[in-house]
Regions:
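Extracellular modular ligand-binding repeats in secreted and cell-surface proteins
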Residues: 1-38
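Feature responds to low-complexity, polar/acidic, surface-exposed segments characteristic
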Residues: 35-54, 67-114, 125-142, 150-181, ...
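Alpha-helix C-terminal capping/helix-coil junction sites
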Residues: 61, 120-121, 188
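Alpha-helical membrane segments in multi-pass integral membrane proteins
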Residues: 177-190, 216
Length: 228
């Protein structure tokens, strides 16, 4: 059996469910998670259950995709970096063993080196040059879409069976980079990115930095709608 995936997050009053899959026959079994065992309860800065970001944070914490930043903090408003997003996907993939030559010379911390090598070798993320990865560079919302859809195609083998969204319905569609349009249209169609409301209109904010709470929510939707 695999390590299991939380398919329903528990709340203070309702039980949750964790589903395990047999690695040989694909049979599944479930386990009840007691009520009151909110995965993010140990963090002092996570918004309450009524907040839009709570479920995504719970999901990512419960499934080992994201952890805190220390001192009982999750830092939901903190910008997500390139190193962090590849580490999250590496966690999602089960931290497979990697070997080979690392082409990047700017990786200063050990915690993300295996994830960066995995992302580079699979083609999920490339460097900012032949020898630099820029691990501390913030990722934008459109970059998250490109990275996730690239992971879906190159690692999961997902093929498009959906109709891409029409980005022209968003007032800031013109600010989407040409290289990100297809991936962002797919991400919107799959419910991974829904846009941000402002003044009665919904904006994509493709150049906006992706916060940890946004990434957690996007990842939850990705796991439920794409990586099934």
């Amino acid at each position: 059996w695999d390590g299991g995936t939380v398919t329903k997050e528990p709340t203070e009053t309702e039980t949750g469910t964790k589903t395990f899959t047999c690695t040989r026959c694909s049979e599944t079994k479930t386990e009840t998670i007691p009520a009151g065992s909110c995965p993010s309860a140990g963090f002092t800065d996570v918004p309450g259950e009524g907040n839009w970001a709570h479920a995504g944070i719970d999901y990512c914490v419960a499934n080992g995709l994201m952890s805190g930043v220390g001192d009982n903090l999750f830092a939901p408003k903190m910008t997500t970096t390139r190193a962090q997003i590849v580490q999250i996907l590496y966690n999602l993939e089960g931290e497979p063993k990697v070997s080979g030559t690392m082409p990047f010379t700017d990786l200063t911390q050990n915690w993300y080196k295996d994830a960066v090598l995995w992302a580079y070798q699979t083609g999920v993320v490339s460097g900012t040059s032949a020898t630099t990865f820029a691990p501390d560079l913030p990722v934008t919302r459109e970059q998250i879409a490109v990275i996730l859809m690239g992971y879906a195609e190159k690692v999961l083998g997902v093929t498009r069976t959906w109709t891409p969204a029409d980005l022209s319905t968003f007032p800031d569609a013109g600010s989407v980079s040409g290289w990100a349009k297809d991936a962002l249209a797919d991400a919107v169609a799959l419910g991974l990115i829904s846009g941000a409301s402002n003044g009665g209109q919904t904006y994509l904010e493709p150049q906006g930095s992706a916060t940890r709470e946004q990434v957690a929510t996007i990842l939850m939707e990705f796991c439920k709608n794409v990586k099934k």
